Amino acid sequence: MKYLSIFLALFLIVSCKQKEKETDALGVVNISVTGNKNALPHFKKGLLLLHSFEYEDAREAFQKAKKEDPEMAMAYWGEAMTYNHSLWQEQDYVDAAIVLEQLDEINSQQETTELENDLIEAVHILYKPKTEKKERDIGYSEFMESLYKKYPANQEVAAFYALSLLGSVEEGRDDVIYGKGAKIAKGILKENPNHPGALHYLIHSYDDPNHASLALDAANAYSKVAPDASHALHMPSHIYVAMGMWDDVISSNIASYQASLNRMEKKNLDNDSRGYHAFHWLEYGYLQKGNQEEAKKMVLDMKKYAAETPSKKARVHVVFLKGTYLTETDEWDGEIANIPVDITDLNISVRSQYHFLEGMKAFKEGNISKLDSVLNTMEQDHKRESFVVAEGSSKLCSAVTRDEATEMDLKESEIRQNQLMALRAELNNDLKLAEEHFIKSIDIENSLSFSYGPPSIQKPPHELYADWLLTQNRNEEAAEHYSLALKNGPGRLRILKGIENTKQVI
């Protein structure tokens, strides 16, 4: 009996550890914080989830830590951090400010370490009152740099400094700053190869075709290190898309989307908890493999989800999936092309994507009046939003969301307008004007930094121009522009087919 009791005790310990591993496989972080023993596991889980951008679940974990220890200062720090989504252009200033007020009330009575006090000061800079968001982001990053120098061996300080660098770039990419972030992330990984933040931020730092191969090892590792974070299962596909690794894009996003469904069922959530982002990338992967049947089913499923829960998030993704399907398949006369979407309250970039699809459909049908109507709507929309952006928005003490127009949104919209204007000119047999608009769309694209993932400009400018050049029997020029398109979209099926067509037509 004695040996049996020992065996049972060991079995229970192993079983508990296995269960913990299965449910909380989120990576490894090393940080000591002040708090009671019941609060610490919740804090650690929140920190791990925070590094994988699982903001809602991270917030829930930090709130549990607060409940276990209402005077645990770092639990308030963590919750406040969940309201800043630096790489998604989102910030909930008001809710963060409420948490920081609570923190200020308890922090004066609570003994905290010097490191904790420094991190608390950092988060106050991130939400500094009466200060524009851009200024706050830069100030926060500069302060994190000072902490990085002060605590050179602290992996968490390094990780959040790396992220702050990426977040200090207001729009697009800055290779110098992103390279600096990558260097810091790689330094962490040398000491802790299972750090979820370092893996995650390294992938973001190298998320373009020119650098993607430098993060391939991190991409392959991240989903294994943090498989219980849906976003960690998706993130490797950023590198896989940039390298044209379509089978891996598909497998990554199947896993990520399924993880979101598991969470949805576990927490009894609505359709908005579905991983629509991964769902869109999965559709794109299928289309690059020529699996149009599965992709079409996904668009129809997305239509159904949006009908059941007609949120902004759902409607945005109907536009995304519809647009990706149509531009990749050219099925402008099918049922997908006729799916309506209420875009009135969406970002101008999404609205212009939808208008582009309507314009392309009109062009394919030779419906000049419809195309003119679409172009007029786009022009008025662009003027109105340009005025709003020119007036500026101080972002002193308000939420920042993706609904608000940015300079990049306006330029992307202008690209789509010029593409449709080129096609309109072709319908009018004005080939010179058509070419001018095609070239202008390319020039605008060249002024922007690389946009990762499925193309935001659904029909990339070099690719659409090359398609048009083929119709003009200018095959060598078409081949040149297909090659240029391939640099931004390695392995894209329509580009590869276009290159083959230039050879056949000659």
Q: What are these regions, as identified by a protein language model?
A:
Residues V14-S15:
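C-terminal motif of bacterial Sec signal peptides marking the signal peptidase cleavage site
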Residues N38, K45, E79, E121, ...:
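Structural register within alpha-helical repeat arrays
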Residues H42, Y76, Y83, D118, ...:
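TPR repeat positional signature
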Residues Y55-D57, E79-T113, E121-E135, S168-V176, ...:
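Inter-helical turn/loop elements of alpha-helical hairpins
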